């Protein structure tokens, strides 16, 4: 869709009619009206008790589907809920999270790492040899105006549920935390996208070509084949 035509499909109240064909070949008409909807990619946040050999552990579960700024307040509320409930373990469900804002990914990783990672490397941004002067390090911080809420107290490791749809900013969080705490992956192998882009505009056209890679505090990156799970479990959601 050309940029000049975007208002035709993004303005609220626009009515569009579609003819679609089902798997059986039968056609039917659909009418859709555009509207504004509140967005949040936090679909579930809860705390449950898990029996252990030492007794019972309070485990927080967070299903997070996209790194968008609109989810900031919901993430903040979720972490407040986890702390109030006394959660000491976290299951972070990124099965369907294909990425999004690197700034928000840094905020989430910083909240998980807490004071032990504050000021440490979140991502070492590397351009090619012709643009090495643009390289920079993005540090962990709990004071960036994004996700200023509480860190999860007492967290020493994190369990992440993954799938082939786990990509980009999701993998960035996994890779960033690994130098500082155990990150246990459960599910499927992730997508494998250790690269990013900075949009460039030329002659009225904006290009989003890949132009940098990301490394963690140990210089680890280039996970083009994705991260393999520590415990492989097939997704039972069709």
Language-model region placement:
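C-terminal, low-ordered peptide segments at domain boundaries
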Residues: 2-87
């Amino acid at each position: 869709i050309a940029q000049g035509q975007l208002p035709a499909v993004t303005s609220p109240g626009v009515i569009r009619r579609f003819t679609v064909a089902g798997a059986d070949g039968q056609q039917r008409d659909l009418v859709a009206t555009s509207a504004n909807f509140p967005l949040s990619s936090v679909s579930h946040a809860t705390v449950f008790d898990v029996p252990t050999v030492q007794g019972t552990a309070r485990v927080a579960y967070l299903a997070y589907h996209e790194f968008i700024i609109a989810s900031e307040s919901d993430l903040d509320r979720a972490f407040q809920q986890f702390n109030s409930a006394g959660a000491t373990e976290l299951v972070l469900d990124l099965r369907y999270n294909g990425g999004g804002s690197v700034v928000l990914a840094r905020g989430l990783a910083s909240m998980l790492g807490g004071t032990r990672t504050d000021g440490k490397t979140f991502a070492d941004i590397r351009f090619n040899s012709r643009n090495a002067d643009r390289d920079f390090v993005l540090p962990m911080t709990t004071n960036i105006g994004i996700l200023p809420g509480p860190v999860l107290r007492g967290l020493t490791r994190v369990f992440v549920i993954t799938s082939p749809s786990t990509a980009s900013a999701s993998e960035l969080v996994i890779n960033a935390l690994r130098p500082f705490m155990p990150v246990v992956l459960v599910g499927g192998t992730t997508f494998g996208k250790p690269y990013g882009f900075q949009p460039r505009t030329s002659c009225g056209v904006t290009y989003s070509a890949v132009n940098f890679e990301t490394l963690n505090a140990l210089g680890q990156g280039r996970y083009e084949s994705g991260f393999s799970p520590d415990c492989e479990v097939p997704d039972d959601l069709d």
